[in-house]
Amino acid sequence: MKITIFCLTILTLSITFGETNEDVKDGSLKEMDEMSLLQELMSVEAALVEKEMKAEAEENRDSREKRCWGLNVPCENENSPCCKPYVCEKTTGYGWWYKSPYCVRKGSG
């Protein structure tokens, strides 16, 4: 009888403390899972922020006004980037001397 009571007491204590140890293990596993999820979330957030910054830089680069050539600047052909009031034309004043068209006002050459 004493042995039975002793065995039941040990069994009860082992079950009680065994569950406590499992709770501690579960708690530490949950913390580790939370930390890994947090690190994963931070890496995803960093990637999204980097992507957004690249998109913003791309947008700023595309929205910048393109450079154009001013009055009396030599141009190569009609598709050269003369500024808006000017066009690339062969002129009688400069074209015959330098043998290239120039950016001039529309209708002046």
From Swiss-Prot:
Disulfide bonds join 68-83, 75-88, 82-103. GO terms for molecular function: sodium channel inhibitor activity; toxin activity. GO terms for cellular component: extracellular region. Keywords: Cleavage on pair of basic residues, Disulfide bond, Ion channel impairing toxin, Secreted, Signal, Toxin. It comes from the Eukaryota. Residues 19-67 form a propeptide. It is found in: Secreted. The keyword Secreted applies. Expressed by the venom gland. InterPro entries: Toxin_22 (IPR012627). Residues 1-18 form the signal peptide. The presence of a 'disulfide through disulfide knot' structurally defines this protein as a knottin. Probable ion channel inhibitor. Belongs to the neurotoxin 14 (magi-1) family. 07 (Jztx-56) subfamily. This is U6-hexatoxin-Hi1a. The lineage of its organism: Eukaryota, Metazoa, Ecdysozoa, Arthropoda, Chelicerata.
